[in-house]
Amino acid sequence: MWIKIIDGEINKPKLVNLDYVSCIFPDDDGIHLVMSDGCVLISISKEYPYNKLCEILTKSSN
């Protein structure tokens, strides 16, 4: 599943494939999405808060 987040490092929209997200965790600067290749994206999207991302990832893994 693809979603559009606001990338906190460049402050611009970025498409992210949630199938490649290994884990997520909240931090002071946003929600960190650890990708399967080890890359870390920082989402500052108000549309996808931590709880909503957890819910989406749980549903997509089933």
Q: Which stretches of residues belong to each language-model region?
A:
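Acidic, Ser/Thr- and proline-rich intrinsically disordered linker/docking segments
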Residues: 1-14, 20-62
